[in-house]
């Protein structure tokens, strides 16, 4: 999948386009769109207490937690004490947006992931909710 055109685009809080810039979730939304697996956009989770972030994400976004990284999936990290997400573009590498460098590629192991997710379609998300 093509993503070279996204590299070095500046960081922008709540950014969702190449023209305005991206935040980490914005780049994940863009990559999922390009992959044909749209990721629901969410409001600014930085305003939520840390204890509620995972519940909000797992309940409001079309993702499913998985045990290991998967190309086309998401990796969750903490960066400077805040929730951060990257899109897994190839084995061992994520594309993500940082405040100081904008959109970059980083080896997953440097980021020390705390969770991995796959993006699921709406019918799978509804099925998962019913199973709970």
Question: What are these regions, as identified by a protein language model?
Answer:
Residues 17-35:
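Active-site nucleophilic cysteine motif
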Residues 40-111, 120, 125, 129-130:
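...with weaker cross-activation on analogous glycine-rich loops/strands in unrelated enzymes
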Residues 4-16:
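A glycine-biased structural micro-motif
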Residues 1-2, 80:
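Absolute protein N-terminus
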Residues 1, 131-132:
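Short intrinsically disordered terminal tails
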Residues 3-4, 21:
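Onset of an N-terminal alpha helix
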């Amino acid at each position: 999948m093509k993503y070279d055109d996204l590299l070095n685009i500046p960081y922008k809080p709540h950014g969702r386009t190449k023209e305005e810039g991206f935040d980490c979730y914005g780049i994940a939304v863009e990559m999922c769109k390009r992959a044909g697996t749209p990721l629901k956009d969410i409001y600014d989770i930085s305003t939520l207490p840390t204890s509620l972030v995972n519940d909000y994400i797992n309940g409001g976004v079309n993702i499913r937690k998985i045990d290991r990284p998967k190309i086309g999936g998401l990796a969750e990290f903490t960066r400077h004490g805040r929730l951060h997400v990257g899109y897994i573009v190839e084995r061992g590498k994520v594309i993500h947006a940082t405040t100081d460098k904008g959109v970059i590629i980083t080896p997953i192991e440097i980021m020390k992931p705390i969770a991995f997710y796959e993006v699921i379609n709406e019918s799978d998300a509804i099925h998962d909710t019913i199973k709970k």
